[in-house]
């Protein structure tokens, strides 16, 4: 389950921000996760709850926003939506696709006290 190490990385970012900006508690974390990232949102919530115990983010609500997958189709010369990494172009049926979006994961915003 790679979500555990990802959740630990998110907590590290939060703790670094808490030291830098002098806040004591995080109440909400907004996390953007790309549809093609391979991250399971339910597993991420579970792991986040586990790793944030006894931290500035203990009890924080994790809000996950899913970013759509996109790719550049070399045959169509168009940006197209993608539901899976090795899918085919919805316009021409081709497989010459370069993923351009939906693989990222980032902390978008923190609500703090």
From Swiss-Prot:
A molecular-function term among this protein's GO annotations: zinc ion binding
InterPro entries, alphabetized: Hydgase_Ni_incorp_HypA/HybF_CS (IPR020538), HypA/HybF (IPR000688)
Binding sites annotated in the UniProt record for Ni(2+): 2
Cysteine pairs bridged by disulfides in the record: none
PROSITE patterns, per database record: HYPA
Domain of life (superkingdom): Bacteria
Metal-binding is among the record's keywords: yes
Signal peptide: none
Binding locations of Zn(2+): 73, 76, 89, 92
Keywords recorded for this protein, A-Z: Metal-binding, Nickel, Zinc
Gene Ontology biological process terms, A to Z: protein maturation; protein modification process
Family per record: Belongs to the HypA/HybF family.
Function, in words: Involved in the maturation of [NiFe] hydrogenases. Required for nickel insertion into the metal center of the hydrogenase.
The protein's name: Hydrogenase maturation factor HypA
Organism field: Albidiferax ferrireducens (strain ATCC BAA-621 / DSM 15236 / T118)
